[in-house]
Amino acid sequence: LGIHERNPTQGQPPRVMMRAMPSLVSTGRSPINVSASASFDAVAPVAAAAPPLSLASPPDPGGADAGVAVVAGAGASMPPDGCGGVVDAAASSAQLEALDAPARLDWAYRTFGAGLALTTSFGIQSAVLLHMVREFAQRSGVRVPVIWVDTGYLPPETYRYAEQLQELLGFDLRAVQATMSAARMEALHGRLWESGTLEDLELYNRLRKVEPLDRAFRDLGVRCWASGVRGSQTDHRRAMPPLQAVRGLWSLRPLLNWSRKDVFYYIEQHGLPQHPLFEQGYSTVGDWHTSAPDDGTTSGRDTRFGGLKQECGIHLPGLMGEGI
């Protein structure tokens, strides 16, 4: 890869060698349970010795964690931290700026306890956060749920990659789908991605991505979710803070200040598998009909959605958000 960047994980606990772990979610032949109803089991921490940061203990309702920036009496529409206090987004973001990615996950669990979840698309860089959440579980004894929105239109390579990472890392995967089947959506609305209009793309993203994800958040009681958004992906993302209010929840971005080389350095350092489409020239992968390899004139998220837009509908504060 020709990578001569700094090590983005400097200061992490010593590397834990990976081993294959049994699937944590299974039904029938597949280790992944894809559910349209999103009826999830409660997430319970597993027993482990308390590390120095006391990660295995959720926030004490008797008093705010000294490392958590909260304010009282404001922002009542946003979910509180685990102590009932209101999170001060500006102060917390300033605090998070000084932390590396694993420490940001530690902070989020100390702040939100069982209200923390992670989202994944099983895309080009997804192995990084999935490996971090596995290592978080190993050092803290806490299994953070990983939510995957299966649109029904992902490339075959993505489905196989999801199986590979799940079997390798053994994270607590919660796969969710839209309540409307792909066939019914196409019968009622047509093949929305073929019309060439932003309105149809936004309807598609709302039906296949945003609504299933928000339903999963409600069913799991999520107050904060971590995602793999990086500032270098788009101009808009470059202006994002590490912590932001998004559709009534807190959005945490552990990898916000990582470069593309940082991502591939981490994958190489930890011996993680690459998405199969990476070798075919893809720098980002979503649904099969809105993803394309870099062609020398466009790259990154400029290759998505036929060039009409860069984002799918997840990470912005409004109804429609910015991509997974």
Predicted regions and their residues:
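Nucleotide-activated chemistry modules centered on ATP-dependent adenylation/adenylyltransferase
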Residues: P22-V25, R29, V34-P61, D65-I324
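Intrinsic low-complexity, disordered N-terminal segments enriched in polar/charged/small residues
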Residues: E5-N7, R15-V16, S30
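Low-complexity, intrinsically disordered Ser/Thr/Pro- and acidic-rich segments
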Residues: L1-I3, A74
